[in-house]
Every structure is written in structure tokens, then in C-alpha cells.
Amino acid sequence: MNSTMQALFVRYKNALTAAGFFALALAFRLWHLGTPKGFIFDEVYYAKNAHSLLLHGVELDNGKAEFIVHPPVGKWLIAMGIKIFGFNEFGWRFSSALVGSISIVLIYFVAQRLFNNYYLSCLTALLTLLDGLHLVHSRTALLDIFLMFFLLLSFYFILLSKHWLAGFTLGFALATKWTGIYYLAAFFAFMIYVDYRQEKAMENLTPIKSTLQNKFFIRSTQFILIPVVTYVTTWMGWFLTPNGWDRNHSKNPLLSLWYYHTQMWQFHTNLTDKHSYQSN
């Protein structure tokens, strides 16, 4: 078998394997997806927020004892399922099941890049497919499965040296949950370290300081500027309506958004109430 035929065979084998994992994962996640009935844990917030996004383009400030404390991207994804299947248990959980299933395929290809071994990649995907925590988050309308997907996709783009795309997906991760910022910082620091090691390996063929300064600027654009711009852009529905939380705090919408974010920050840093779902 010549190299061209071998490459084609590997490509088709990977495609068929990925399709098989996706079909199996989706079957596991869609089976009785509408059960249990009613809202599970924070579905009571996210499903309703997603429905509000679908109807009004923004999570409305309705004056009730409720505060929207997470960015909108994950809830927009939940809204897609509601748009297709209606405001019911299956509808608000569908996007989680779909994205969770796609993430199994993504994990397979990440493992291929890391191990370059078909069987290890299959084992990695299979273990994730059967993992209880992944399965539960793929069957509930919570934000964590979307956060995981965007972070994993960012890592995959880094493995492919598509750093600009990694920046965009990190922005979407941050716009799903703020905890994405820790991974953004880690990826940024990792790329700075990689650049430094590569320049050291060049044995001073070019001035290291000048080259590193240029690369630092590029990495800052890829892993700071692009994620921030992407993050702010995801709030477009909030910008385009007067009914969002704190939207009218200032005549300058950016100042209103900043104020809203300070309120969100205070909520997260001062939250001390206990609940029956928390871990020990």
C-alpha cells in the first residue's frame, strides 16, 4: 500500500470510528432524555433564561428575586434545543446531549494528536463516553458540558497550531462560565513557554529578545484580545435591548455592562448559602 492510499485508509478509518462513537454517545444521551420530569438542580434557572433569550434576545430583568450570574453562550445553546423541540424537558436538555456527544468525537481526535495510536484513542473516547459525570452533564440543561466542549476545542486547535481559532473558542468558553479564564491563562502561559523554548533551541540565529517580544504580542492578541472581543460580542442581545439586567445603569452601554459584571463578581465572591447538592 503506497503512502497516499495508506493516508486515505487512515482518514476513512478515523471518520468511521468517530461516527460510530458519536452515534453510540448520542443514543446513550437521548435515551429517555425527558426523564425525570421537571427541572433538575439549576435547570430551573438556565432553562428559563434560555427561553427568555429565545423570546426576547436577552434574559429579562423582571424585578423578581432572581439574578443572572453567568454569561449567555451556554444558555443560547440550550435555547436552540427549546427552539426545535419546545419548552419541555427534552427540549431544554437536547443541546447538552448533542454537544456532549460531539465532545466524545473531539476527545477521540485530541487523543489521536497526543498519542498517535488508534487503540489508545478509542479507549480514551470509550472511557469518556461511559463516564458517569460526563453522561449526567450531557443529559441536563446545565452549563458545564458547554464549557468543557469549548475548552477541549481550544486545546485541539492549539494541538493543530491554529492559535487564532483557539482564541475565539476560549472567548466562547469564557462567555459560558467565567471559570474558563483559568484555562485561558494556562494556555497563554503554556504558549509563551513553548515560544521561549523554541527560540532557545534556535541557538541565537536571531535576537531572542526581539523575537520573543514579537511573539508575545501575537500571543497576547490570540489569547487575550480575541477572547475578550469574542466575549463582549456574545452580549449583543443585552446591548440591543433596554430590558437586560442593569442595562440602563448608565447612558454608556459599556459602563452598564461593566457595572453588571461587578455585581456578578460580588455575587460569586460573597455566595455562602449552603444547599443539599453541594459536596462535602
Enumerate the language-model features and the residues they cover.
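Membrane-integral, polyisoprenol-dependent glycosyltransferases
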Residues: N2-T241
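Membrane-lumen/periplasm interface segments of specific transmembrane helices
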Residues: F216-N280
